[in-house]
């Protein structure tokens, strides 16, 4: 029997012991016949987190608690310590939706080539918003047009693919996860799973952004890779600015009507 791929789960954390404990519990509940190595990169949260991480049995494959350069620097540090065939980024307070999620992901990749060269994603549930998201089937054009957001915490990446495309771009800001996903998508099509893989904590900074920031990042992403949803830069930028204007006005009137109804 072929040995099951090793899966590296990378968790970043900062000042969130309760959320970290929930994430660790979720990882340790996985029923997967292969090895799961759990790597925790904490940004120097304090003695309580250090005591928790050092006291966990069995121990982590690797953990540290020290200042870092932000979430994507921490994620890149996690990549550097990972030895698995498949990398999964599950941040503090996020959880796998059930005990068989890792096994489901590996099974979905089975027979499609070397696991370390593939990537894929499923759906996530936005905790507190009663909403499920996951753009299946995946469309590169819709992704570039801002009509699809791939749930990063419900995504998994082969280690060889990550080595090929490089880590997270620290200069790209909060949307570096989507830029990372674009680089993966330009190498190969994702394998998709039409079920919820992750419970996503929506209190993070990336969950609430102004339309100008979201669509500005999409324009910058297209320029960086010279890939546009409608072929040319000019028409694609005009389209994205139009969607930005529509999103801004929709939010404005929603806020007006909300205040009027109080």
Swiss-Prot record:
Transferase is among the record's keywords: yes
Record has Glycosyltransferase as a keyword: yes
Protein name (Swiss-Prot/TrEMBL): Uncharacterized glycosyltransferase MT1564
CDD domains, A to Z: GT_2_WfgS_like
InterPro entries tied to this protein: Glyco_trans_2-like, Nucleotide-diphossugar_trans
EC top class named in words: transferase
EC number: 2.4.-.-
Domain of life: Bacteria
Species this chain originates from: Mycobacterium tuberculosis (strain CDC 1551 / Oshkosh)
Family annotation (Pfam families): Glycos_transf_2 (PF00535)
GO molecular function: glycosyltransferase activity
Family: Belongs to the glycosyltransferase 2 family.
UniProt keywords, alphabetically: Glycosyltransferase, Transferase
């Amino acid at each position: 029997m072929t040995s099951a791929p090793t899966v590296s789960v990378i968790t970043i954390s900062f000042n969130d012991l309760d959320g970290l404990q929930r994430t660790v519990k979720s990882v340790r509940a996985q029923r997967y016949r292969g090895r799961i190595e759990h790597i925790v990169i904490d940004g120097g949260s304090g003695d309580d987190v250090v005591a928790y991480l050092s006291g966990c049995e069995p121990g982590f494959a690797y953990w540290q608690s020290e200042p870092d350069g932000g979430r994507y620097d921490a994620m890149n540090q996690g990549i550097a310590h990972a030895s698995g065939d498949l990398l999964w980024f599950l941040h503090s307070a996020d959880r796998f939706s059930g005990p068989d999620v890792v096994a489901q992901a590996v099974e979905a990749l089975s027979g499609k080539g070397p696991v370390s060269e593939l990537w894929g994603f499923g759906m996530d549930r936005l905790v507190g918003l009663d909403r499920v998201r996951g753009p299946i089937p995946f469309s590169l054009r819709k992704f570039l047009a801002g009509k699809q957001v791939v749930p990063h915490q419900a995504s998994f990446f082969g280690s060889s693919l990550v080595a090929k495309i490089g880590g997270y771009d620290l200069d790209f800001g909060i949307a570096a996860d989507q830029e990372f996903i674009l680089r993966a998508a330009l190498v190969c099509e994702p394998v998709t799973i039409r079920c919820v893989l992750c419970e996503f904590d929506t209190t993070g900074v990336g969950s609430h952004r102004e339309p100008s920031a979201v669509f500005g990042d999409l324009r910058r992403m297209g320029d960086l890779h010279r890939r546009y949803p409608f072929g040319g830069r000019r028409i694609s930028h005009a389209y994205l600015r139009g969607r930005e204007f529509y999103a801004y006005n929709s939010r404005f009137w929603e806020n007006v009507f909300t205040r009027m109804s109080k």
